[in-house]
Amino acid sequence: MDAVVKLFKEQAETEAQRQMPVHRPVDAPRPSRAEAEAAVRTLLAYIGEDPHREGLQETPARVIRSYDEIYGGYALSPDDVLDRTFGEIGSFDDFVLLKDIPFTSHCEHHMVPFMGKAHVAYFPVERVVGLSKIARLVDLYARRLQTQEHLTSQITTALDEALKPRGVAVMIEAEHMCMSMRGILKPGVTTLTSQFTGAFRDDPAEQVRFITMLRGLR
């Protein structure tokens, strides 16, 4: 029986290693799942809880499993999402806009959520990407510890490098729980960030048209 348990643990650890994020500092070894669960127990004790009481006995394992999902963006790169493009764009010469892409991310300062919507547009030159891929790209970066500014920049850069379009426009609107549920306690405040490249950056009229389409379609 002990041999079976040992084998199961080894398999579990192997599976955990397979999930190792690809974007980690090379000098930062990843703690084991058991070590991560122990850290959760420490935090439970720190806030004044008894991590051994019945209702919390499975909490460390649940928290770490949820982290595998919430922070799953570390295990992917933009190339995994934008690996397939299409060249059949015909005579289309305007920009493609996806608006109101919902997302939830976590603030890197307090590890509490911020959530909102991303609006993404690009001017294709020779190739386009599937619409779902843009939403997946937003999720990829949102499922990491973030600042809203960095999230905006990462989405913009990834599309710019993968598609080589005439321009990219990204706007994000979000509410940050670090303002709503702690600190200044101001729920309902919306933070807006934007970044433009190419035609969107160089031609203010295109920026106006981008924003007009966002507001006009609500």
Curated annotation (Swiss-Prot):
One of its GO terms (biological process) is one-carbon metabolic process. Keywords: GTP-binding, Hydrolase, Metal-binding, Nucleotide-binding, One-carbon metabolism, Zinc. Gene3D superfamilies: 1.10.286.10, 3.30.1130.10. The keyword Transmembrane does not apply. Its EC number is 3.5.4.16. It comes from the Bacteria. GO terms for cellular component: cytoplasm. NCBIfam families: folE, PRK09347.1-2, PRK09347.1-3. Homomer. Belongs to the GTP cyclohydrolase I family. This is GTP cyclohydrolase 1. It comes from Azorhizobium caulinodans (strain ATCC 43989 / DSM 5975 / JCM 20966 / LMG 6465 / NBRC 14845 / NCIMB 13405 / ORS 571). The gene is folE.
